[in-house]
A protein has these predicted regions:
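Ser/Thr/Pro-rich, acidic low-complexity intrinsically disordered regulatory segments
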Residues: 1-3
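Surface-exposed, low-hydrophobicity interaction/linker segments
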Residues: 45-106
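Short cationic amphipathic helices and targeting signals
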Residues: 112-118
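N-terminal interaction modules that seed assembly of large macromolecular complexes
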Residues: 6-59
Length: 120
């Protein structure tokens, strides 16, 4: 099942946290594969350092659901983002193919649209 929308509603920008609020609370591991954003990065990293770390992580940058929600509240604006929940670590290429381990995929494109896909 897929749901999607625009990043602005009634001339107001939708936050990353608001997008995540469409996903039921869970205990899954989440992996960030792309992050081009403005805001506060986790673990006292600069956003530039965090973006580089994410891009250079074979299996994405791992977070719990609670960590992802906390991170989402620190983000002011997102240009591009790809984050997935998965029962086991997956490589980026497997996201494109829809690996069996995938449970949810969240993408934000060019600061304009977002999409959530639920697998299984």
């Amino acid at each position: 099942m897929k749901i999607s929308g625009n990043m602005s509603k009634y001339n107001k920008k939708i936050s990353f946290f608001e997008i995540l609020s469409q996903i039921p609370s869970n205990r899954e591991d989440w992996y960030i594969f792309e992050c081009d954003a403005v805001g506060k990065a986790p673990n006292n990293l600069t956003m530039s350092e965090f973006e580089d770390l994410v891009l250079n992580s074979k299996y994405g940058y791992q977070m719990s659901w609670d960590e992802l929600l906390k991170f989402s509240k620190e983000i002011e604006d997102i240009n591009n983002l790809i984050v997935v929940s998965s029962t086991s670590p997956v490589e980026f290429e497997m996201i494109e193919k829809g690996a069996e381990a995938l449970q949810v995929r969240v993408e934000i494109y060019d600061s304009t649209t977002w999409e959530i896909e639920f697998y299984g």
